[in-house]
Amino acid sequence: MIELHSPQYLKVTFALAFGSFLVFCNLYLFQPMLPYLANHFAVSETQINWLFAASTLALSLCLVPWAVTSEAVGRRLVMLTGLFAMPVIGLAMLYAEQFWFLVLTRALMGVALAAFASVAVAYMVEELSPQAFGKAIGGYIAANSLGGITGRIAGGLLTDALGWQHAVVAMAIFTLLGALLVAYLLPVQQHFKPQRGLFFHHNRALVKHLQNRTLWLAMLIGGVNFALFVNLYSVMGFRLVAEPYSLPIGIASLIFVCYLAGTLSSKLTANWNRRFSAIPGMMLGALISMAGMLIALIEAIPA
C-alpha cells in the first residue's frame, strides 16, 4: 500500500486531484455561456439549459456502468479513457451549427466525465493506506470545487473576450495536456484484482438500495439542495447580463467566486459532526441557503 507522504503518494494524489479538477472544469465550462448561447442559437432560456442538463444527466446515468467496467479492465484504464475522450468531444462541439448537435456532444461529454468520476475514489481505496486515503480524499474533494469555479470563470471570461468556440478550444487543449500529465504520474495499480460478470450483481445491489426509504430521503434532500444550488447560479447568470445590470458575460461569471464559500464550509463539516449531528447541520444549511435565495431577490442595495 502507498503510505502517507511517500513519493508515490504525492504522485497519486496530485494525479487524481488534477484529473478531478479537469472533469469539473469541463462539466461547468458552459454554465456562464448560457445567456450568450441562447442568443447565438435563438432558443429560450429553458431550452438552452439542456446544454448543462444533458452533460449532468449523462454523467449520473453512466457512473454505475463505468464502475462495473472498471471491475473487469482496471480503474486506471477507465479513468484515462475518459480523460482523453474529453478533448476530442470538446473539439467536436466546434462543428455544432444546430443546437441539437451541441446538446448531443454535451451529453457525450457527460459520458466521458463519468469514466473518471466513477472510479477515482475506488483507485484510492485500493492503493492507499487508510491514513493516506483519509488525507487524499480531502484534496480530491477540494479539487472538485476548484475545478467547478475555474471552469465557470474561464468559460465566462474567454467567451466574453474571444467567443464560445475559442473557450472550448482552450479547454480542450488544457484538458489534453492535463490528461497526458495524469497518465504520466498515475501508476498502474498493484492491488487491483479483475472481476467479471458483475453487471447484474451491481444492478441488483442498486435496486436493493433504492428500496431503502431512508436512502430515498437522503437522496431527495441532497438532490433538491444541489439542484437549487446549481440552477440559482444559472438564473443569476441570465439576470446579470439583462437589464438593469447589463454586465458583460466575463464580469457576470465572477459571481461563481461565491462558490468558494461552499469550499470553506465543507471543510467545517467534520468539526460540526464531531460536536453536534448531521440533521441539525442539514437544517442550518437549508436555512442559510433559503436566506441567500431571498437576498438574491433584491434588485439593488441602496448606496
Regions found by a protein language model. Name each.
Residues 2-5, 187-218:
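Juxtamembrane intracellular "pre-TM" segments in multi-pass secondary transporters
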Residues 42, 74, 95-101, 129, ...:
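Helix-breaking motifs and short loop linkers at transmembrane-helix boundaries and internal kinks
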Residues 61-97:
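Conserved MFS/SLC helix-loop-helix module at the cytosolic interface between two early adjacent transmembrane helices
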Residues 63-74, 264-277:
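Helix-to-loop junctions at the C-terminal end of transmembrane segments
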Residues 78-91, 280-294:
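Structural signature of the two symmetry-related core transmembrane helices
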Residues 89, 100-108, 303:
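Paired small-residue
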Residues 105-144:
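Cytoplasmic helix-loop-helix junction between adjacent transmembrane helices
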Residues 139-186:
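Helix-loop-helix hairpin linking two adjacent transmembrane segments in secondary transporters
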